[in-house]
Amino acid sequence: MERLVGKPAPEFEMKAVKGDGRGFTEVKLGDYKGKWLVMFFYPLDFTFVCPTEITGFSKRAEEFRDLKAELLAVSCDSQYSHETWINQDIKQGGLGKINFPIASDKTTEVSTKYGIQIEEEGISLRGLFIIDPEGIVRYSVVHDLNVGRSVDETLRVLKAFQTGGMCALDWHEGDDNL
């Protein structure tokens, strides 16, 4: 896998369902110019770990926006699958309304560019990328299919980057930079 951290983020343009499940939009990297972007890939809709991550990030979306960061979820499912999942009753395995779009990487082009595509399965690993306002990848983490990511850690890392300084082990907001 080619290193992305410190390099311009690979361009993308994808169809997405709006977080409220009411309509579609196009999302592209250029839409986020001037803002931080936390883009996270997940394997499939209607699964077990994925909704815990998506709803976890959604519940804290305002904290990301307060940091001038936008959230974007991506999977290889179609935008229609995303729409159905958002609009399906939670008690029946639905996701419910969320606070950011979910994009469709149906062609797997984007997950391949970001180095997280599992070709033989047609899905992506759990990759998360923090892209700065100039479009540079500042952080990436990739998890196996079975382990979800941490919203707290993502916020901590985002805040650390926004200090503009060097942050030591276990740095937290309010700590001094090196």
Curated annotation (Swiss-Prot):
Keywords: Cytoplasm, Disulfide bond, Oxidoreductase, Peroxidase, Redox-active center. It is found in: Cytoplasm. The keyword Oxidoreductase applies. Residues 3-163 form the Thioredoxin domain. GO terms for molecular function: thioredoxin peroxidase activity. It is an enzyme of class 1 (oxidoreductase). It holds the Pfam family AhpC-TSA. The keyword Cytoplasm applies. One of its GO terms (cellular component) is cytosol. Its EC number is 1.11.1.-. One of its GO terms (biological process) is hydrogen peroxide catabolic process. The active site is at C50. It catalyses: a hydroperoxide + [protein]-dithiol = [protein]-disulfide + an alcohol + H2O. InterPro entries: AhpC/TSA (IPR000866), Peroxiredoxin (IPR050217), Peroxiredoxin_AhpC-typ (IPR024706), Thioredoxin-like_sf (IPR036249), Thioredoxin_domain (IPR013766). Homodimer; disulfide-linked, upon oxidation. Belongs to the peroxiredoxin family. AhpC/Prx1 subfamily. Thiol-specific peroxidase that catalyzes the reduction of hydrogen peroxide and organic hydroperoxides to water and alcohols, respectively. Plays a role in cell protection against oxidative stress by detoxifying peroxides. The active site is a conserved redox-active cysteine residue, the peroxidatic cysteine (C(P)), which makes the nucleophilic attack on the peroxide substrate. The peroxide oxidizes the C(P)-SH to cysteine sulfenic acid (C(P)-SOH), which then reacts with another cysteine residue, the resolving cysteine (C(R)), to form a disulfide bridge. The disulfide is subsequently reduced by an appropriate electron donor to complete the catalytic cycle. In this typical 2-Cys peroxiredoxin, C(R) is provided by the other dimeric subunit to form an intersubunit disulfide. This is Putative peroxiredoxin in rubredoxin operon. The lineage of its organism: Bacteria, Bacillati, Bacillota, Clostridia, Eubacteriales.
